[in-house]
């Protein structure tokens, strides 16, 4: 399903990205570990990312 969460560190790019849990229920982009998800929305103003799980 689709989910929107806050992100920490750098904003993920739209497309496939490796994401992992971060602090306070947010996610972050990682190069190793995590899982690959399809990112379809990035809102840098709100600090949120929407992706398909």
Give a label for each model feature.
Residues 1-53:
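Surface-exposed, low-hydrophobicity beta-strand/loop segments enriched in small/polar/acidic residues
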